[in-house]
């Protein structure tokens, strides 16, 4: 269980997040949706301890960063580190010993090659594998399906189901509504740095229609397509 209370974040005079209040329970999957620039990634970085902020983040396990697996949109890799070394490095950081990484290479990645030579999708799969093997209790997945092939999307989705079954908390951001509909128990709509709506699974279709309405409006008509 993790609770966010009155979390706010500003860069100078620009307010990015304002009075965010959220509760994430164990064994549930949550979606965060919003336009580009709405503050999703900033919120994730605040939870992960990568950004200073006002407000409180309260967790039953202690500091979130000590048990959090954070899959960033564009994971960072050192230039001279192989895929295998990257996984080992992240596991060592949590005092987790994994001697059979080869057996757990579910995405069939070339682990002996430098990670910086990987494609965007391969990098994301490598980073995802690493945080899975860290034995985390909370997972934040920022656009986990972007740039990843359909086969891997299926695997990622099934892993999310498994993590939920194990009692983990999972927070996902995605612009792919069908995926959120398949995986999430609750979705929060973030707009201009504020949570303006939360909906349970049975109401997802209504949220999708609302988002289309305020996102598209009459923009397509303005094109006057012929």
What kind of region is each of these model predictions?
Residues 174-175:
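H-loop/switch region of ABC-family ATPase nucleotide-binding domains
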Residues 48:
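Helix-to-loop junction immediately C-terminal to a conserved catalytic motif
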Residues 139-143:
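Catalytic Walker B motif of ABC-type/P-loop ATPase nucleotide-binding domains
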Residues 128:
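Hydrophobic anchor residue at the start of the ABC signature
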Residues 33-35:
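The feature captures the beta-strand-to-loop junction immediately N-terminal to the Walker
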Residues 150-151:
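Helix N-cap at the start of a conserved alpha-helix in ABC-type nucleotide-binding domains
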